[in-house]
Amino acid sequence: MTLQEEIIRQLGVKASIDPQEEIRKAVDFLKAYLRKHSFLKTYVLGISGGQDSTLAGKLAQMAIAELREEASDQAYQFIAVRLPYGVQADEADAQKALAFIAPDQTLTINIKAAVDGQVEALQAAGVEISDFNKGNIKARQRMISQYAIAGQMAGAVIGTDHAAENITGFFTKFGDGGADILPLFRLNKRQGKALLKVLGADAALYEKVPTADLEDQKPGLADEVALGVTYQDIDDYLEGKLISKVAQATIEKWWHKGQHKRHLPITIFDDFWK
């Protein structure tokens, strides 16, 4: 088995999908998790205005709406959370995403004071924080807020990790990579876009340039620039297609580099890192 085949196997990616079938599969998955854990009544998800959180949010709201009706239990709620750092440049996109999702509840927590306070505390201790590292603090602070909300509201936190993100390790360890449930896992970027099209999302929500937008000194830095490879190449690779040797080497480099992010903390019994 080639490395490409092994990665595809691990991430469960199909070469082609039926968007309607994948929507139903994700909604049923989200419903089943709450049914199994009867002490949970809500899903919590940060909404940025990008493709991934828009799709995960819509699927979550659909699942909660069905559960609420089927169980005749109004306690089932989907809580969308806006988590800007100061003023978000593409706030209009975030509002457009919320209008499309139509969540039961929307909360806004501005993380700027918490992030800046942490950076200042570290600097006071003599630890200078790089702009890149500060970006990771932002991602982790967003998850602190989401878990605080979930803890108070009998909730589980939804993550937006999908195959094109997982293969490159393009997420913050214990930041956006930390969640309870991943409804998009198995889908690549273009497949997620296909689901949003079927769901009737505004094209602007899935045609915009993907960006983590975590660094102050590189606002709106495109994912593809940061990774050095296009999502088209990543998606093609995940669908078992041939791509250029340069693109393949870049993708596989990120796969190896990000292995530690796909595991729980390393124990003496683990050998994946050796």
From Swiss-Prot:
What pathway does this protein act in?
Answer: Cofactor biosynthesis; NAD(+) biosynthesis; NAD(+) from deamido-NAD(+) (ammonia route): step 1/1
The EC designation for this entry is 6.3.1.5
Q: Which residues bind Mg(2+)?
A: D52, E165
**Highest classification ranks of the organism:** Bacteria, Bacillati, Bacillota, Bacilli, Lactobacillales
Instruction: State where ATP binds.
Output: G46, I47, S48, G49, G50, Q51, D52, S53, T160, K189, T211
GO BP, one annotated term: NAD biosynthetic process
Tell me the name of the encoding gene.
nadE
The protein here is known as NH(3)-dependent NAD(+) synthetase
What would be an example GO MF term here?
NAD+ synthase activity
* Broad enzyme group: ligase
Protein purpose: Catalyzes the ATP-dependent amidation of deamido-NAD to form NAD. Uses ammonia as a nitrogen source.
The residues listed in the UniProt record as binding deamido-NAD(+), with positions renumbered to this chain, are: R140, K173, D180, H260, K261
Gene Ontology terms, cellular component aspect? cytoplasm
Q: Which organism is it from?
A: Streptococcus pyogenes serotype M1
User: Self-association or partners: how does it assemble?
Assistant: Homodimer.
Q: Membrane spanning segments where?
A: none
Q: Which family does it belong to?
A: Belongs to the NAD synthetase family.
Known catalysed reaction(s)? deamido-NAD(+) + NH4(+) + ATP = AMP + diphosphate + NAD(+) + H(+)
Arranged from A to Z, the UniProt key words for this protein are:
ATP-binding, Ligase, Magnesium, Metal-binding, NAD, Nucleotide-binding
